[in-house]
Amino acid sequence: MADVVVIGAGPYGLAVAAELRRRSVSFRIFGRVMESWEQRMPEGMLLKSEGFASNIGTCSSVPTLEHFCARHGHPYADTGLPIARGLFADYGSWVQAQVAPELESARVIAIARDEHRFMIELDSGERLRTSQVVVATGLLGHAFVPEQLAHTRACITHSSEHRTFDDFAGREVVVVGAGQSALETAALLLAKAALPVVLARTAELVWNTAPGDRRRAPSRLLRPQSGIGLGWRALITERAPQAFRHLPAATRHSYAFQT
């Protein structure tokens, strides 16, 4: 019996697998490597994170993105050089071969629990028991369309439903939202000769500022750079995640929204 079952083989699932292996904890990992990145993310997508903040986990046994790029002849910079979706997906597949070569493609279809163990059922028909389960299935299963728009689904889609935007050429498209997905979708629509209009409940759009090494010293001191954004709040959250975890839920949600 494996001590841990990891569900999902994207960046987080692979990072967990690497750490479990480092600690000599027995595990089984299920999923298809980087599936969402390969099949559900839009063509032309660029990561919001900088190169130095796009490594899969922090375990020393996991090669960094910089190492992957150097080995395979791809350009790389800690900051200022956008990372393409396809490059990151290839990096993930390369990492999987090293930290989780025993990845199983079976899908978990049911989880139950008794007093001591979790019971896992796979689509292959196999059933197994484990002490711990890590769910690392990503966010695509949580795509949200407001109920006020549900009756117009014939002409409304969620951004996660599109790999390409070729069919929108020459058409006016309203994009609702002001985050990563919304602004990225608007940019990709524009690149395909569509006419996007962004609707958001904010007076201004806040997007990536210039990387830290391009800012003047006073700005870097007042708002230091971290892997999750600029500012002391983001830096402390990154360096002391256990302290952040103990903050009240409302405070954590507020910080996450503002970072």
Locations of the language-model features?
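Flavin (primarily FAD) cofactor-binding/catalytic cores of flavoenzymes
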Residues: M1-M34, A77-T259
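N-terminal glycine-rich dinucleotide-binding loop that anchors FAD/FMN and/or NAD(P) in oxidoreductases
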Residues: M41-A70, R214-R239
